[in-house]
Curated annotation (Swiss-Prot):
It holds the Pfam family URO-D. Catalyzes the decarboxylation of four acetate groups of uroporphyrinogen-III to yield coproporphyrinogen-III. One of its GO terms (molecular function) is uroporphyrinogen decarboxylase activity. It comes from the Bacteria. It is an enzyme of class 4 (lyase). This is Uroporphyrinogen decarboxylase. It comes from Bacillus anthracis. Substrate binds at R27, Q28, A29, G30, R31, F46, D76, Y152, S207, H320. The gene is hemE. Its EC number is 4.1.1.37.
Length: 348
């Protein structure tokens, strides 16, 4: 069954005029929600993501609670890696830990290929369930970017400085490019499968790419990103790029064949546009503001909206994920304010 959905978010992704500014929040499904915390008392992340009914419920929860204009699939960026032979464990308080880190070209050559229908059927089943039976807003599929995935695979887990990753990139360029190309192939196949299952947009998260300078990005990372976006673009859905602490790379992202440039709070929207970013923009509230009094939040959000609304193609989001300490009522109030304030301003 084809469901009728609110396409305000998709229109903004395409740079079209909208009646109000659409909003959704990274990590909108998760630790800030009491309902989610109750589920986590019984089930692990692995168990939730491998259970389509449970995963769909968690994904839809913020749509019902906060009235956001898009849902994003609840899963981890590491989800596809076991399919290609990476031993990943999500450890509480640490994050992803990899038992077989990449150290050589031989390690890269041992990696396999992903077949989503066989390797991650539970993810595709969750998407189908959400898009055919549950959601009245678009579902965003996503993947980690090759650099961020490679950094986990080389470091063996989270890192503060990514020295091992960059040292590998500089010292072992043949192995580096083999790894990045292998991961690009995986990301392309993975995102296409999510779109075929029903995702109406996709976002690529390059969480740690801000550690790389512009010159190195152009040589070591950008060619693979160009290939990913060019290949996935043939699927006909909007594509979003997001990273953290990567304001120096926004023009490099803008050059890619994508639709939406994601910004964090370090770069004002008006400054990004002054630098030549004329594609749709998503962002860019510092999530720390969500812990402030409402009067402070409201004034800050007005400033962001006033910048974003100066041209069509603007989606409100955070510059990073929702903190566990954030009150869900604050997010609900925030969405209502974004919708009402922007509708009033855009009607003038």
């Amino acid at each position: 069954m084809v469901r009728t959905i609110n396409e305000t978010f998709l229109k903004a992704c395409r740079g079209e005029r909208t009646d109000y500014v659409p909003a959704w929040y990274m990590r909108q499904a998760g630790r800030s929600q009491p309902e989610y915390r109750k589920i986590k008392e019984k089930y692990s992340l692995f168990e939730i993501t491998h259970n389509p009914e449970l995963c769909a419920y968690v994904t839809k929860l913020p749509v019902d609670q906060y009235n956001v204009d898009a849902a994003i699939l609840y899963k981890d960026i590491m989800s596809p890696l076991p399919a290609i032979g990476v031993d990943v464990e999500i450890k509480s308080g640490i994050g992803p830990v990899i038992d077989n880190p990449i150290r050589s070209l031989q390690d890269v050559e041992k990696l396999g290929e992903i077949n989503p229908e066989d390797d991650v059927p539970y993810i595709l089943d969750t998407i189908r369930l959400l898009t055919t039976e549950m959601l009245d807003v678009p579902l965003i599929g996503f993947s980690g970017a090759p650099f961020t995935l490679a950094s986990y695979m080389i470091e063996g887990g989270p890192s503060r400085n990514y020295h091992n990753t960059k040292a590998f990139m500089y010292a072992e360029p043949k192995a580096w490019f083999a790894l990045i190309d292998k991961l690009a192939d995986m990301v392309i196949t993975y995102l296409k499968a999510q779109i075929n299952a029903g995702a109406k947009a996709v976002q690529i998260f390059d969480s740690w790419v801000g550690t790389v300078n512009v010159a190195d990005y152009r040589v070591f990372i950008k060619p693979a990103m160009e290939r990913i976006f060019a290949e996935v673009r043939t699927m006909g859905v909007p594509m979003i790029m997001h990273g953290v602490g990567a304001a120096h790379l926004v023009n490099e992202w803008h050059d890619l064949p994508l639709d939406v440039v994601g910004l964090d709070w370090r770069l004002p929207i008006e400054e990004a546009r002054a630098r030549g970013v004329h594609k749709a923009v998503q962002g860019n509230m510092d999530p720390s503001f969500l812990l402030a009094p409402w009067s402070v939040i409201e004034e800050h959000v007005k400033g962001i909206l006033d910048q974003g609304m100066k041209q069509p193609g603007y989606i409100f989001n955070l510059g990073h994920g929702v903190f566990p300490e954030v009150n869900p009522d604050t997010l609900k109030r925030l969405t209502t304010f974004i919708h009402e304030y922007s509708k009033g301003q855009l009607a003038k």
